[in-house]
C-alpha cells in the first residue's frame, strides 16, 4: 500500500493594513493586526494579535496572487476582497507574484509568555492580480533559437539519461586505502598530502631518473631500530647514531682517497639521521607499531601513512610514485615535505624532492 505524503502545517500571518482583502477586513473587525491562515490537512484562518514562532508574516498592500518561496517550501495564496485560497501543492494554471523570505530574530507572546522566536518576513507588492490565467502551455514547445524538439517526452528523457549514467564506466578517483589513511590526518596534513600527490612525477619521469642514476648510488641495507620506551635506551640510540655517522664519514673519506672518480657509497647524511631520530622520539601513534628502517637508493613501499610539512637541510631527496608504490633517490639537498611510508612492519621516512 502506497504511503501517504506527510504534510507539515504552515502558518501564514497576513498583515493588510488597508483592509482591502478578506483577511484584512476580518482582522480589522476583530481589532487585531493579523489574520492567521493555517494550511495542513485542512485550511483555516482567524484574526490574531501577534504571529507565532516559525510563522510567515506576509505584508500585502491589497488583493493579489502571492507565492511565498522558502527554499523547497512553496506556499501559493489567492487573496481577494471576498475570499481566500491557499495551498502548498502545485498550482500552475494561475500567475503568481514570487515573494522571497527574510528570517528575523524577534520576541513574541506565545501561549501567554514572551519568548524569543524566529519569524519569516515577506512583503508583497500586489503586482499580480488574483486569478490571472497562465498563458504558457506546458505541453507546447516554445520557438527557441538553437533548440530542437526531442523525440522523447520529459519522463522518457530523464530515464534515458539516468540509464546512460548508470551504464557508463566509472573511474575510481580514490582508493579505499587512501580514504582510510586520510581519516588519521588533520586538516593541515591532509592538505599537504593532496599537494604532494599532485607534484609527484609520473611513471615515465621515475624511469628516466632510475636510468640516469642507476650507477651513481649504491643501496644501503642498514636497518636501525629505535626502542623509545625508556630514557636509557634513548641515550644508547643517540650514541649509536653518532657512531654510525662517524663510520659513514670514515667510509666517505676512504672512498675519496682511493679514487676521485668513484661516487659516494652512501646517501645517508648525519642531518638525515638526526631528523629521523627526532621524528621517532615524537611517539606518533601512527608509527608506534613500526620499527624504523633506512631507505635504499630505490625501493618499494606498502602504503603511504602521512605527508608532513617539514623543512630539512642536507638530506637525501626522493621522488616516488604512489600508484606503483615505488620511490627513487633524486639527490641530496633541502626539502619542505617529508613522506612517511611503511613496508612490511618497518617505517621509512622519505624527504620529498622537487
From Swiss-Prot:
Keywords: RNA-binding. Residues 163-196, 229-269 are annotated as: Disordered. GO terms for molecular function: RNA binding. It comes from the Viruses. It holds the Pfam family BTV_NS2. InterPro entries: BTV_NS2, NS2_N. Residues 250-260 have a biased composition (Acidic residues). Residues 178-196, 237-249 have a biased composition (Basic and acidic residues). Single-stranded RNA-binding protein. This is Non-structural protein NS2. It comes from Bluetongue virus 17 (isolate USA).
Amino acid at each position: 500500500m502506497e504511503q501517504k505524503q506527510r504534510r507539515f502545517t504552515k502558518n501564514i500571518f497576513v498583515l493588510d493594513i488597508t483592509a482591502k482583502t478578506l483577511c484584512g477586513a476580518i482582522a480589522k473587525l476583530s481589532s487585531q493586526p493579523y489574520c492567521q491562515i493555517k494550511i495542513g490537512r485542512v485550511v483555516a484562518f482567524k484574526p490574531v494579535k501577534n504571529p507565532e514562532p516559525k510563522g510567515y508574516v506576509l505584508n500585502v498592500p491589497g488583493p493579489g496572487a502571492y507565492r511565498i518561496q522558502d527554499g523547497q517550501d512553496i506556499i501559493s495564496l489567492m487573496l481577494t476582497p471576498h475570499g481566500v485560497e491557499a495551498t502548498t501543492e502545485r498550482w500552475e494554471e494561475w500567475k503568481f507574484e514570487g515573494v522571497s523570505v527574510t528570517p528575523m530574530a524577534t520576541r513574541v507572546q506565545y501561549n501567554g509568555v514572551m519568548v524569543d522566536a524566529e519569524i519569516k518576513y515577506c512583503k508583497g507588492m500586489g503586482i499580480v492580480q488574483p486569478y490571472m490565467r497562465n498563458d504558457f502551455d506546458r505541453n507546447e514547445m516554445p520557438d527557441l533559437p538553437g533548440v530542437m524538439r526531442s523525440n522523447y517526452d520529459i519522463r522518457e528523457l530523464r530515464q534515458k539519461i539516468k540509464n546512460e549514467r548508470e551504464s557508463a564506466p566509472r573511474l575510481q578517483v580514490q582508493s579505499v586505502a587512501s580514504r582510510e589513511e586520510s581519516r588519521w590526518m588533520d586538516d593541515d596534513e591532509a592538505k599537504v598530502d593532496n599537494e604532494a600527490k599532485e607534484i609527484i612525477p609520473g611513471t615515465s619521469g621515475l624511469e628516466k631518473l632510475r636510468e640516469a642514476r642507476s650507477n651513481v648510488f649504491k643501496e644501503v641495507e642498514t636497518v636501525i631500530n629505535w626502542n623509545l620506551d625508556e630514557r636509557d635506551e634513548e641515550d644508547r640510540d643517540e650514541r649509536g647514531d653518532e657512531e654510525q655517522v662517524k663510520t659513514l664519514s670514515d667510509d666517505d673519506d676512504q672512498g675519496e682517497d682511493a679514487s676521485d672518480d668513484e661516487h659516494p657509497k652512501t646517501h645517508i647524511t648525519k642531518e638525515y639521521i638526526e631528523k629521523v631520530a627526532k621524528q621517532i622520539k615524537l611517539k606518533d601513534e601512527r608509527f608506534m607499531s613500526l620499527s624504523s628502517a633506512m631507505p635504499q637508493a630505490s625501493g618499494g613501499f606498502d602504503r603511504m601513512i602521512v605527508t608532513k610539512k617539514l623543512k630539512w637541510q642536507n638530506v637525501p631527496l626522493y621522488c616516488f610514485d604512489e600508484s606503483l608504490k615505488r620511490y627513487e633517490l633524486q639527490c641530496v639537498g633541502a626539502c619542505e615535505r617529508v613522506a612517511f611510508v611503511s613496508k612490511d612492519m618497518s617505517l621509512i621516512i622519505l624527504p620529498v624532492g622537487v
